[in-house]
């Protein structure tokens, strides 16, 4: 059989294939074998050339001519079509052509593997794989003739869809697939599509008369539509470019317009629209920056206005609870807003932190304090608030209140001040047995450790340990003490861990001094080498009174107890006699007598003088036999607490200053030991950087500490540069 005859058989098969008529597997294999025979059998060659290569080349050329003729016929058949009709015809013809060509490629696979692959290896650019050959012919003979009309038709359909019409997107996706297969999608279609998109949305923005909220809803819908459109029938490379183009025109170019509504939405608490604005603006570069700035200003403004109202309403009577509650209210509003509407954005959280720190550290309430206490007022109030929460009979029902208190601490620079105030109040709760729950105390200290570190809570942890040990020791001692009528509890305080208060010396009643001596003996028996010092200034007690018409239980300090105990012997004493009896100074005696001689319900009465100016030595102090009080348990320590409150505040300030100097000096030595040599400016900056988590170091104090260390020969000024410090080993 001649090669022409074999080609005739193949041509019949191709006609069947491209007409999409049924082809049996047997017929398919017969065509495959025919291709194989042409490419391998020399007897099929004509008389002029009987090589397989000649036959393969003949077959390749014949197939190329066949496909070209077929494509030209299709082109001529639909040349008059346009618009959606053209797209429909193109879709049908392309789908048929693509399917038939893939089968054709399989039939001629042997030609691909041998003849074509060798030509490709030899870099013969005219010979390509059969499927690629068919695509090249389709592009050259068909698509190049309809390219403009086809792309215009696609863009027209997309425009109709954008304007609300329903279209047959199958035609678009099929043509887009064709463009992609022909490798001309990005060159021929994508740029025109993006240009048309930009033109459409620029015109839409120009014609828009919507409010900001209406516009945001429109943009949301438009972006959703474009993303959906891209997924439905556009190439994968287009999505990002398409969305970028839309975002640029609809959002970036309209940021000022969008941002203009932000403050009003904040004031009105329109979370839904704030979320919408945030979601849109976060899509573009610098879209959130102005919002962040607006938010920070708004938080700052609301924080200060809230505290101004509180200062105006309550003034100096502002309670720690009122103050901390207001701080938390403002913070919680915007913390929840950022969580809900702004997806917990880190930059927005930073703005919340910055604004909160600003209005918490200095505000209208702190300005009511004496100037020297203004910077520490927030720390003071926070410590008092925590004390209220942890005391028995706390009126605060919120179980998370203590956790929220730590939120305020986060924004207080003077954390060392809070530490000292909290330590003082914690000490009082332990001494007075006024804690609501030991578990709550320990949990708060654990949380405080987690946020501020082990060193920060070292003394508090030691105080807890001391309190536990004290309970065990008290229980053991009660079993052996001889005086059973007096209930006695002891609290051991490790030196340095507990607040340092004024130490006083007084003469205790015999019954009490006997118990103390017994405890000394008991303690020393099992703790050899340790010495106990009784801190009378921190002692508290309860005494039963039968001197009045009604029985009372008085809660008193040690000094008050000793003073009242004298009246078991007689009804009146002079100030001088009381002072000698309990071995206290005249000034201290006047203060104690004054605490028992308040204006309302005095237990003792004095015939002349007053506490403020000091009672004269000969002033007679008598038991008020007419004393009456509605309460059975009466706390007589209240007056002393009020009198010592300011002194304790000043003491905390002095302790803070002393501790800070020590920390600054230690920090300087650490830095210089590591760095060996540093300029003055770099040293100052390094000190502030290392200590800012505990407090904000005062530059003047740093300079003083540097001079002290120079005098103590830890560092020196460089001989060559006066502004440089050197470490002395």
Curated annotation (Swiss-Prot):
Residues 659-720 form the Cullin neddylation domain. One of its GO terms (cellular component) is SCF ubiquitin ligase complex. GO terms for molecular function: protein-macromolecule adaptor activity; ubiquitin protein ligase binding. It comes from the Eukaryota. Neddylated; which enhances the ubiquitination activity of SCF-like complex. It holds the Pfam family Cullin_Nedd8. SUPFAM superfamilies: Cullin homology domain, Cullin repeat-like, Winged helix' DNA-binding domain. InterPro entries: Cullin, Cullin_CS, Cullin_homology, Cullin_homology_sf, Cullin_N, Cullin_neddylation_domain, Cullin_repeat-like_dom_sf, WH-like_DNA-bd_sf. One of its GO terms (biological process) is protein ubiquitination. Keywords: Isopeptide bond, Ubl conjugation, Ubl conjugation pathway. Disulfide bonds: none annotated. There is a cross-link at residue 673 (Glycyl lysine isopeptide (Lys-Gly) (interchain with G-Cter in NEDD8)). Gene3D superfamilies: Cullin Repeats, Cullin, Chain C, Domain 2, Winged helix-like DNA-binding domain superfamily/Winged helix DNA-binding domain. Belongs to the cullin family. Probable core component of cullin-based SCF-like E3 ubiquitin-protein ligase complexes which mediate the ubiquitination and subsequent proteasomal degradation of target proteins. Probably interacts with skr-3. This is Cullin-6.
């Amino acid at each position: 059989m001649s090669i022409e005859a074999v080609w005739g058989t193949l041509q019949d098969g191709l006609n069947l294939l491209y007409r999409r008529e049924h082809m049996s597997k047997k017929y398919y294999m017969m065509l495959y074998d025919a291709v194989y025979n042409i490419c391998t059998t020399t007897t099929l060659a004509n008389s002029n050339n009987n090589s397989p290569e000649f036959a393969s080349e003949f077959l390749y050329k014949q197939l190329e001519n066949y496909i070209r003729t077929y494509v030209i016929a299709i082109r001529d058949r639909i040349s008059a079509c346009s618009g959606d009709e053209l797209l429909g015809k193109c879709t049908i013809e392309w789908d048929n052509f693509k399917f038939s060509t893939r089968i054709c490629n399989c039939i001629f696979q042997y030609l691909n593997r041998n003849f074509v692959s060798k030509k490709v290896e030899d870099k013969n650019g005219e010979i390509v794989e059969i499927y690629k050959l068919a695509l090249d012919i389709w592009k050259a003979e068909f698509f190049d003739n309809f390219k403009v009309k086809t792309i215009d038709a696609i863009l027209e359909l997309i425009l109709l869809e954008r304007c609300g019409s329903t279209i047959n997107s199958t035609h678009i996706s099929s043509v887009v697939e064709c463009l992609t297969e022909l490798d001309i999608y990005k060159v021929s279609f994508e740029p025109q599509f993006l240009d048309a998109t930009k033109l459409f949305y620029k015109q839409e923005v120009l014609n828009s008369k919507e409010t900001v909220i209406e516009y945001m809803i429109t943009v949301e819908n438009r972006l959703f539509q474009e993303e959906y459109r891209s997924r439905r029938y556009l190439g994968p490379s287009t999505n990002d470019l398409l969305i970028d183009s839309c975002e640029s025109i609809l959002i970036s170019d309209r940021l000022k317009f969008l941002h203009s509504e932000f403050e009003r939405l904040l004031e009105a608490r329109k979370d839904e629209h704030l979320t919408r604005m945030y979601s849109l603006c976060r899509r573009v570069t610098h879209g959130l920056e102005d919002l962040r700035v607006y938010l920070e200003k708004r938080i700052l403004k609301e924080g200060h206005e809230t505290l101004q109202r509180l200062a105006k309403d309550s003034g100096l009577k502002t309670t720690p609870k009122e103050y901390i509650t207001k701080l938390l209210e403002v913070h919680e509003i915007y913390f929840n807003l950022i969580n809900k509407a702004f997806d917990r954005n880190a930059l927005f959280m930073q703005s919340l932190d910055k604004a909160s720190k600003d209005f918490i550290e200095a505000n209208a309430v702190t300005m009511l304090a004496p100037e020297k206490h203004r910077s520490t007022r927030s720390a003071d109030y926070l410590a008092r608030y925590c004390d209220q929460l942890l005391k028995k009979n706390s009126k605060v029902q919120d179980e998370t209140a203590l956790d929220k208190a730590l939120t305020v601490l986060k924004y207080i620079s003077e954390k060392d001040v809070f530490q000292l105030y909290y330590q003082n109040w914690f000490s009082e709760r332990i001494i007075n047995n006024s804690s609501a729950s030991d578990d709550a105390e320990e949990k708060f200290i654990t949380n405080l450790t987690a946020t501020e570190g082990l060193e920060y809570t070292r003394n508090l942890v030691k105080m807890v340990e001391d309190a536990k040990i004290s309970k065990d020791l008290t229980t053991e001692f009660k079993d052996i003490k001889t005086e059973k009528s007096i209930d006695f509890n002891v609290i051991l305080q490790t030196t340095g861990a507990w607040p340092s208060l004024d130490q006083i010396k007084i003469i205790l009643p015999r019954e009490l001094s006997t118990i103390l001596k017994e405890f000394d003996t008991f303690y020393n028996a099992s703790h050899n080498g340790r010495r106990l010092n009784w801190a009378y200034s921190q002692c508290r007690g309860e005494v039963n009174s039968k001197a009045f018409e009604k029985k009372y239980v008085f809660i008193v300090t040690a000094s008050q107890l000793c003073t009242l105990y004298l009246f078991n012997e007689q009804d009146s004493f002079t100030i001088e006699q009381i002072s000698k009896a309990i071995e206290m100074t005249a000034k201290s005696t006047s203060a104690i007598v004054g605490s028992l001689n308040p204006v309302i319900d005095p237990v003792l009465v004095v015939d002349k003088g007053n506490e403020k100016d000091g009672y004269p030595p000969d002033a007679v102090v008598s038991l008020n036999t007419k004393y009456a009080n509605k309460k059975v348990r009466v706390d007589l320590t209240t007056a002393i607490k009020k009198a010592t409150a300011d002194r304790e505040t000043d003491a905390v300030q002095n302790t803070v200053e002393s501790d800070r100097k020590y920390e600054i000096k230690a920090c300087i030595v650490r830095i210089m030991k590591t760095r060996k040599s540093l300029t003055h400016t770099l040293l100052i900056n390094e000190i502030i950087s290392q200590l800012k988590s505990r407090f904000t170091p005062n530059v003047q104090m740093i300079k003083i500490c540097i001079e002290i260390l120079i005098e103590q020969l830890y560092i020196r000024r460089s001989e060559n540069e006066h502004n440089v410090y050197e470490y002395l080993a």
